[in-house]
């Protein structure tokens, strides 16, 4: 593990060994809250990736035939080690990502839950059998692992998203090559250390740090059979098209613009609490963030009054400090991009209720306070595009029909939420909203690991979603056997 006090150079994890990249290139990994250099991550090349894939391919010959209960026992041990190191993992998340320690602690919990699901997944790997499909003939379906799987993960959930991928893939008998975000590489290396301690054989999990060369290498390598990706919409589309053209199974989870509809009969205090947490938690850098509030009818004025008050009370600072809610964004470049969106929102006619650019926290960190817009319309850029930052837009409409129509105009469809006490409104919302994950009176309707993370439209590219039974389907292939006895 890197010495965080000296900014030590990180290494790739290939074949159970920590190895230097052949490229000789590195990139600094700063703490977003302080600018302090935590480590230097290698920007690996194709040769590094080829070595990892070759090792994973060789390891698959044994791991793919390892009895399922034995694989599950390694995962149960891994889960135990993650629990024992919970606080350390949460601190690492905060150091390299910037989110508050409380949120990081919750992220580690979600990652552990993914490992728990993977450890218990053998019951979902069972096949099916039907005797006597004809006289003295029986037929059965069996599941087999697919081989070497590649995973490409983002900076915003350095614990949870990798744990969506490699534990379940490995439980299903595959081997794995992970390319974590070069912005948050520390947590990935620690996950590999703990998995090795749990008894995972060499070569089953490999980590290659880097950027475009490693990504393209995974997408094009003939020995990589499937790709799981989480990231922005343009990159997700590229990953899906490129990997598909090279004959791979692909799931690519993309961007979002999640809408929250607030009805006049809603519990406003509860709605505001949920919306503020969903919009500004993790600095808005998550694909389930609340990005747009749709205020229906006469609820708009009292809702705006309560929202403004709640947003003004948000505490900003280093995520390791007590009582901090909003940490920094990931990099200075992302801060500047977000500030440009805020400026554009003003120019296009939105009402800037609270300007996060005016919050003075620290000149060394990448801090941006919570921003709140009112009177946003669907013609504005800040409504159309994913900002991925602590910016919330409020749109005013007159009816639930109008709110649903507006929400469905978005090219993204990860999630949507409704705040109401009326069952008829819930039923209408549930049936008519074109999005994959819906919340009723809660702000982040992300499912547990045993359900699929089911984005729609331009929020997802592929057929089988991450997690749940979809995940098992994605990481296995079926073989039909028909026999006469």
Swiss-Prot record:
Active site: 287
A molecular function (GO) term: malonate-semialdehyde dehydrogenase (acetylating) activity
Name of this chain's protein: Malonate-semialdehyde dehydrogenase
PROSITE patterns: ALDEHYDE_DEHYDR_CYS
Pathway(s) annotated for this protein in UniProt: Polyol metabolism; myo-inositol degradation into acetyl-CoA; acetyl-CoA from myo-inositol: step 7/7
InterPro entries named in the record: Ald_DH/histidinol_DH (IPR016161), Ald_DH_C (IPR016163), Ald_DH_CS_CYS (IPR016160), Ald_DH_N (IPR016162), Aldehyde_DH_dom (IPR015590), MeMal-semiAld_DH (IPR010061), MSDH_GmP_bac (IPR023510)
Catalytically driven reaction(s): 3-oxopropanoate + NAD(+) + CoA + H2O = hydrogencarbonate + acetyl-CoA + NADH + H(+); 2-methyl-3-oxopropanoate + NAD(+) + CoA + H2O = propanoyl-CoA + hydrogencarbonate + NADH + H(+)
SS bond list: none
EC number: 1.2.1.27
Functional description taken from the UniProt entry: Catalyzes the oxidation of malonate semialdehyde (MSA) and methylmalonate semialdehyde (MMSA) into acetyl-CoA and propanoyl-CoA, respectively. Is involved in a myo-inositol catabolic pathway. Bicarbonate, and not CO2, is the end-product of the enzymatic reaction.
Any Pfam family hit: Aldedh
Classification via PANTHER family: MALONATE-SEMIALDEHYDE DEHYDROGENASE
Gene transcribed to yield this protein: iolA
Organism of derivation: Halalkalibacterium halodurans (strain ATCC BAA-125 / DSM 18197 / FERM 7344 / JCM 9153 / C-125) (Bacillus halodurans)
Family per similarity comment: Belongs to the aldehyde dehydrogenase family. IolA subfamily.
Keywords, sorted A to Z: NAD, Oxidoreductase
Higher taxonomy: Bacteria, Bacillati, Bacillota, Bacilli, Bacillales
One GO process term, biological-process aspect: thymine catabolic process
Binding site for NAD(+): 155, 179, 182-183, 232, 386
Oligomer and partners: Homotetramer.
Signal peptide as annotated in the record: none
